[in-house]
Amino acid sequence: MARRHVVRAAVSVAAAATSLIVAAPASAAPGVGSPGLGDPYFPLAGNGGYDVRHYSLDLDYVRATNHLDASAVITARATQDLRRFDLDLRGFTVSRVTVNLLPATFTREGQELVITPRVPLRRGKTFFVKVEYRGEPTEVIDPDGSSEGWVPTADGAFVVNEPQGSPGWFPANDNPRDKATYDMAITVPKGITAIGNGRLLSRRDHGGRTTWRWYEDSPMASYLTTATNGVFELRISKAGRIPLYHAVDPTEVPDGAFERLAAEAEVIKFFSDLYGQYPFSSGGGVVDHAPEVGYALESQTKSQYDSTPDPSTVVHEISHQWFGDSVSLTVWPDIWLNEGFATFSEWIYDEKHGGPTAQASFDQVYARPATNSIWTRPPGNVGGPQFLFTGTVYDRGAATLQALRVKVGDKTFFRILREWYAHNRDGNVTTADFVRLAERRSGQRLGAFFDTWLYQPAKPTTW
């Protein structure tokens, strides 16, 4: 994510990760899935007792009334015997729920949709949930005061979800640990373009409306989904064999939005050479006119820009496809694994393209006085969800990587980054995982180094 215009931050406590799988003894009666997964910042986000494999979303949106008529079919595997389980959903009127084609009873408890299937679910078995719902999608206000979820625009909606916006428009197991594949059918008035994740399968006009079908075949965290829609010019090109979908609001065309997005092909090649093969089967970006949002987001395969981005923002968001989207955090306090890596990627891109070296960028950060918040609020322990996206996770996070580069040498450092991606592609990680890899590949004990850079509320002086 590009830096927000409001204050935010992140705390990295790898030990706080709780298990997604909670298995009941074989002899026990079917249990109840937990209403949250215990994330240190968002303890009720996500749900226990099952693992989602696929979401099939059918969304029919009318901007004039800001009304969404929708259904979600969720394919999941039970990780314990279940007589009841939850999904995360904000607002809406839920009209019907079925589990394995049988009507299920359901209640609403805050943002929990509590479902009781007619027949209990057995551990290890695949099951299917269909939720039919309608109403006004939710624009979620974050702890830092910024907007996410389904944010209405003049002609549609800008749909971005980090960290907790997706339940504002579809029922989800809203925790980054439970990745799944997705297909979306987004129906909008004719003349409106709807952009989902992955590849465009079809576009069909019918009765004054248009249905856009998208499919993302790589596992994706729920916060990385999108269904942005509005009046856009859509252009399709390629980066090698990878289709790129670029959608731009007409008001942003004169500012060079298409030219900025066209750079994605070269950026993808650069990071593919540096880190490893591009993670996904498609790519692209959306430039909307949504100045009230105030940030860009690395939605998987379709970076979302609230206005025409500068070149460094494009580089930042594309690098997130490796670090953040494919290699994803396990708990939100480890957000520096996303933003620090993407900011360092900006630095190394500049270094290799005639700009400042990464060391020069490090020096600029390090020149900040000891009273600066990046030193007093370390990226591995920033104090709460309201600080998730403050400068420390970006700048001090990136500085941590550059300091590691100097400490272990270029050959070892870039081997660490390549292995980090290769070994964790489509998966979830913690800071502790990265420390172990860095120590193993460098042959050095790095606990004190990472403690100094990530967890101490003071400017590092020796490391």
What are these regions (language model features)?
Residues 1-14:
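N-terminal export and membrane-targeting signals
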Residues 3-5, 18-22, 27-69, 152-155, ...:
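N-terminal, polar/Ser/Thr-rich
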Residues 89-151:
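A surface-exposed beta-strand-loop module
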Residues 177, 301-362:
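Zinc-dependent metallopeptidase catalytic helix centered on the HExxH motif
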Residues 357, 390-463:
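Amphipathic alpha-helical substructures
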